[in-house]
Amino acid sequence: MHCVLAVGGIHLGHCLRDDHDVTAKTWFHYGKAIERLKFYLSRWKVAKPDDLLRLLISTVLLQDFEAIRGNVDGEVFQHLRASRQIASALFNSTLNNDTEIMGVALEAYCYRELISAFRLGVEEADIQQVLNSFVIDLSCLQHLPTFGSCFWYCSFLFMQIPLISQLAGRRQRELREGVDMCCDVEYTHLYNKISSWRPPGQEFSANCEVDIEDSEAVSAMIVRISLLLFLVTSFYHKSITPHELCKITQPWVTEALSLLQFAHGSPTIIALFWPMIVIGSYAREVSDQSVLQRMLSTSTHKMPIVAKGLVLLECLWRS
């Protein structure tokens, strides 16, 4: 309950900036949640499956708290690390995992775990944790009645994120040490998998790659573009000039912004925050930057993380 109240409070507090009572109560509940969580985490190995589920829900909610707040001190990753063994133990437990709450908790954890690798410089130990867990094969969760609440039908794309992060680390070692690590082969393999992916059941014409009336399909294609941008950067980072990289990525930026016009205002737009930040970091045309600036500044999702994302992009655009 303390976790729920803290999450509600941090969102409300951003809308009511001068309400010190809301802020004080929010941090009171957050402090209590952390206090209780530390106590139960020290005993999680002997916890029953029902208690493991409560622990996982608590850590996921605290990740939400820090994410909404803007992940100011990187605390999302601390809560994520606390979730890993609990989620794995819960997944392998005898608890009936067909229940809705179980499905939502496990999928929410997997979503955050995969999204956390959507960046350069991820620690190798964190990548290996994901690659050696059930998270890397989301098909094991597809029997759950709630599956798709976080991933829609593009779980395949999300599963490529840690593989790209792993390639990024290996590619930097390859460039630094001058030893062939077959990164070009892995890059080509990932590029072909991601670029050829399309939303299931979509009818394509010569002029349109996706049904613009299907907001989930449009959003999935935007996620696909953000992964291609991430992949290209992971491979070419420090081996070509920024200008050369932008020449490669500009067609994808143009396509993504076109699709964002159709996704803007749809229920799936909230899940496109990180893809929008990734796409925005490659936007070099003032007109493209203006489109993203308008979308983020007029977003109906009034949260600190959205405001901080826009500030980050504006800093990149000025540099």
Describe each PLM feature range.
Residues 21-25, 29, 75-82, 101, ...:
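Short acidic-hydrophobic sequence patches enriched in Asp/Glu that either
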Residues 300-319:
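C-terminal, low-complexity intrinsically disordered regions in eukaryotic proteins
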Residues 16-22, 121-297, 301, 313:
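Cytosolic regulatory protein-protein interaction regions
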